[in-house]
Design a protein with these regions (language model features):
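A short, conserved structural fragment
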Residues: 48-57
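Minor-groove-contacting beta-hairpin "wing" of winged helix-turn-helix DNA-binding domains
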Residues: 59-65
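Hydrophobic alpha-helical segments
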Residues: 16-19, 65, 69
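Short amphipathic alpha-helical interaction segments
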Residues: 32-49
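Short, amphipathic alpha-helical interaction segments positioned at domain boundaries
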Residues: 66-85
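N-terminal acidic leader/helix
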Residues: 3-37
């Protein structure tokens, strides 16, 4: 008997990309670099969108464009900061 093939739901990759970009805000350093310890498919999509430098390198971090730096801060605050009343 063949093992059942796992059925994965269709993923919203734009939302995943936003979440990763928001998390990159936590590790921003040296004027715009962030650690690249995220899923390769996601970092490749961010690269293709022009938001980060090419993740395929020996460097352990990627450069975020000015647009990506601003967007990562905005997304981080939107997703993870508790709003005080």
């Amino acid at each position: 008997m063949k093992p059942k093939k796992e059925i994965r739901p269709k993923l919203d990759t734009d939302r995943i990309d936003d979440a990763v970009l928001a998390l990159m805000y936590l590790t921003l350093h040296d004027g715009g670099r962030a650690w690249k310890g995220f899923d390769w498919e996601t970092t490749n999509r961010l690269f293709k969108k022009g938001l980060i430098s090419d993740p395929v390198s020996k460097a352990k971090s990627v450069w975020l464009s000015h647009e990506a730096q601003a967007r990562s801060k905005q997304l981080f605050e939107q997703m993870f900061v508790v709003k005080e009343n």
